[in-house]
Amino acid sequence: MMSQLSWSREGETLLLTGELDQDYLNSLWDARHEAMQGVSCIDLGGISRVDTAGVALLVHLVELGKKQGTDVTLLGVSENVSTLAALYNLPQSALPR
């Protein structure tokens, strides 16, 4: 079965569902400015898979939030995301929880 990435908004939360990887993240990348407008939390609870491209996108989304004047936190961070962040020596501020 082919999976994909989808997202929706609930107030100030961006809910991500599916696979956050290089094969599926282009649509979110293209809509990142609109998707992040007013977002203070990114919920990863619905993510089934993530790769390094997905982690890079998360770092970018957090930075985009900062540029828009909002501190963004991540909710539902999987062990996979934490492991990839540690392997790349990302500071806690890059993927704040």
Locate each region found by the language model.
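STAS-like cytosolic regulatory interaction modules
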Residues: M1-A53, V59-R97
